[in-house]
């Protein structure tokens, strides 16, 4: 939930944030390590917490996860290499990294085979391609149970409109491939994501139990996948992690009784661990009136923070004055916040479908700063070079100390691959 920048229970305070642009430039991503540790602790009942690093793949964040005993999920060769760079070691800890995908390219296939990284397969073809190269490989099956859930159609990870997972009626074909190549089945993974919809979560847990029983194979583990929500707006409900665990643990116990031995329970959070830990600081560069609309234009665009333009996602916005004047209780103006891109959709205050909306914000002027809250997940990791704009620096606070964990990309680096 968006926190006040004048609260001292995190390092993401107005005082701390205002000193960063002078040192690191603007815009800049900022994270608080203590918030990440707090979120990890909330899931301590699960046997394995496996971070979906696509949410925030900076290797310094991954090192923090590893130090807290969190394992990692990788969805590309690049993410495998990031995990290795962060100190995860599949040679000494075979379950440190799991590779999850619906397809596997040749380079990734060779790397997971070389390192014997367990593969969470979302297609029968992928299983067969792996088995031909690496017989006996350890595998998970990502199952699509025929229904889904998500905050946007673009984030729905189940049902017939989703590309993800092996369709539940194709599990016999998957088993044929497993047996043909003597693959070792570790477990079944079901990533649907229910947030605070506990009735839907019960449906997911029930589907997991049914799939395991009907599949008729022994398993070491089940994975609840990800999809734990965080409250992006004031008044939104936070997920009850005790209740969430309780429903999944009941499913795990049913499966363990059926199989006749203990079964590990994994969870694969992404946004839950990092979303609330991050903010994006951006500077106001222009204020103008467009008919009845009051626009504030900032130096960050959707190339930096994609979620509002892509999903219509809400991020709370706070204003900080550059000259020290107080804006905390200042009168507000209905404001459209937009970026610098040569693109009409470069608006941070929009709904899904692109409808522009306003926010009640204090009146600001060029040189002031806006802070976009809860950007720790799918912020920096979804950034692009659109409009030939360099990637932003990332800064991590830990116990009051700020350190650079990614420097700003230069224009020279942006051009380097084309200077042949």
Curated annotation (Swiss-Prot):
Pathway: Amino-acid biosynthesis; L-lysine biosynthesis via DAP pathway; L-lysine from DL-2,6-diaminopimelate: step 1/1
Alphabetical list of CDD domains matching this protein: PLPDE_III_DapDC (cd06828)
Residues at which substrate binds: 191, 271, 307, 311, 343, 378
EC number: 4.1.1.20
Positions of modified residues (N6-(pyridoxal phosphate)lysine): 54
Induction: Up-regulated by LysR. Repressed in the presence of lysine.
Gene3D superfamilies named among the record's database cross-references: Alanine racemase (3.20.20.10), Lyase, Ornithine Decarboxylase, Chain A, domain 1 (2.40.37.10)
Gene Ontology process terms (BP): lysine biosynthetic process via diaminopimelate
InterPro entries to which the protein is assigned, alphabetical: Ala_racemase/Decarboxylase_C (IPR009006), DAP_deCOOHase_LysA (IPR002986), De-COase2_C (IPR022643), De-COase2_CS (IPR022657), De-COase2_N (IPR022644), De-COase2_pyr-phos_BS (IPR022653), Orn/DAP/Arg_de-COase (IPR000183), PLP-binding_barrel (IPR029066)
Name of the molecule in the record: Diaminopimelate decarboxylase
């Amino acid at each position: 939930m968006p926190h006040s920048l004048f609260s001292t229970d995190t390092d993401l305070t107005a005082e701390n944030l205002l000193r960063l642009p002078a040192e690191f430039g603007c815009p800049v991503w900022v994270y608080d390590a203590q918030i990440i540790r707090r979120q990890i602790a909330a899931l301590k009942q699960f046997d394995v917490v496996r971070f979906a690093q696509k949410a925030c793949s900076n290797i310094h964040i991954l090192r923090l996860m590893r130090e807290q005993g969190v394992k990692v999920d990788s969805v590309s060769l690049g993410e495998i290499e990031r995990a290795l760079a962060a100190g995860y070691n599949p040679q000494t800890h075979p379950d440190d990294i799991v590779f999850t995908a619906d397809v596997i390219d040749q380079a990734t296939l060779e790397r997971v085979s070389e390192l014997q990284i367990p593969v969470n397969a979302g297609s029968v073809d992928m299983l067969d391609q792996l088995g031909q190269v690496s017989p006996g490989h350890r595998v998970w099956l990502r199952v699509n149970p025929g229904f889904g859930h998500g905050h946007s159609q673009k984030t729905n990870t189940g049902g017939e409109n989703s590309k993800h997972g092996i369709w539940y009626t194709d599990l016999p074909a998957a088993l044929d491939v497993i047996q043909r190549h003597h693959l070792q089945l570790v477990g079944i993974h079901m990533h649907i994501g229910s947030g605070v919809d506990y009735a839907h979560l019960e449906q997911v847990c029930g589907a997991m139990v049914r799939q395991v029983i009907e599949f008729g194979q022994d398993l070491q583990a089940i994975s609840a996948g990800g999809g734990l929500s965080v409250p992006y707006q004031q008044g939104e409900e936070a997920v009850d992690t005790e209740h969430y665990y309780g429903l999944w643990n009941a499913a795990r116990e049913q499966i363990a009784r059926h199989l006749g031995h203990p079964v590990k329970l994994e969870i694969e959070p992404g946004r839950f661990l990092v979303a609330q830990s991050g903010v994006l600081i951006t500077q106001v560069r222009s204020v103008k009136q467009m008919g009845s609309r009051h626009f504030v234009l900032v130096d960050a665009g959707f190339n930096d923070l994609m979620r509002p333009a892509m999903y219509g996602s809400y991020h709370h916005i706070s204003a900080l004055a550059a000259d020290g004047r107080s804006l905390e209780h200042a009168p507000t103006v209905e404001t459209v916040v937009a970026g610098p891109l040569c693109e009409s959709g470069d608006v941070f205050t929009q709904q899904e479908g692109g409808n522009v909306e306003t926010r009640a914000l204090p009146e600001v002027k060029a040189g002031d700063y806006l802070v976009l809250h809860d950007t720790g997940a799918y912020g920096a990791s979804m950034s692009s070079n659109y409009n030939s704009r360099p990637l932003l620096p990332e800064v991590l606070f830990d116990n009051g100390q700020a350190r650079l964990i990614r420097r700003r990309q230069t224009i020279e680096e942006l051009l380097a691959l084309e200077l042949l």
